[in-house]
């Protein structure tokens, strides 16, 4: 995931465990995306847990797609419902280890600044500025 690409070299991250993330509610699509990315960033700050991959089985009210985000091997979502502002995802990765993972830039926060969501027939492109 692009956010974790700032924190370390994702090529050094193995998939050893997973964490489920679910975001429900919100005022609009931007707030849903913000809350989801904020929860994913919280996984790193709480454990610290690195996520090079996130898993996708079905999409509600849209065509199945994969997000293309820099440095991610593959990003998949279990469910995304644009009308009810709900995202469910399974995040795969491992605990951050300074002996294994080179330390990059600290990501302080996700921001709403210039956040954009562009829905297309076969994918959704998102643009998010992070505070480093």
Give the predicted meaning of each segment.
Residues 1-132:
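Intrinsically disordered, low-complexity regions
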């Amino acid at each position: 995931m692009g956010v974790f690409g700032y924190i370390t070299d994702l090529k050094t991250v193995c998939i050893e465990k997973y964490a489920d993330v679910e975001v429900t509610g919100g005022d609009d699509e931007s707030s849903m995306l913000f809350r989801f990315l904020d929860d994913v960033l919280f996984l790193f700050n709480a454990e610290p847990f690195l996520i090079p991959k996130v898993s996708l089985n079905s999409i509600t009210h849209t065509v199945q797609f994969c997000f293309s985000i820099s440095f991610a091997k593959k990003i998949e979502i279990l469910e995304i419902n644009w009308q009810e502002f709900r995202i469910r995802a399974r995040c795969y990765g491992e605990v951050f280890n300074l002996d294994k993972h080179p330390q990059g830039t600290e990501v302080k926060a996700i921001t709403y600044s210039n956040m954009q969501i562009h829905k297309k027939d076969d994918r959704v492109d998102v643009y998010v500025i992070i505070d480093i």
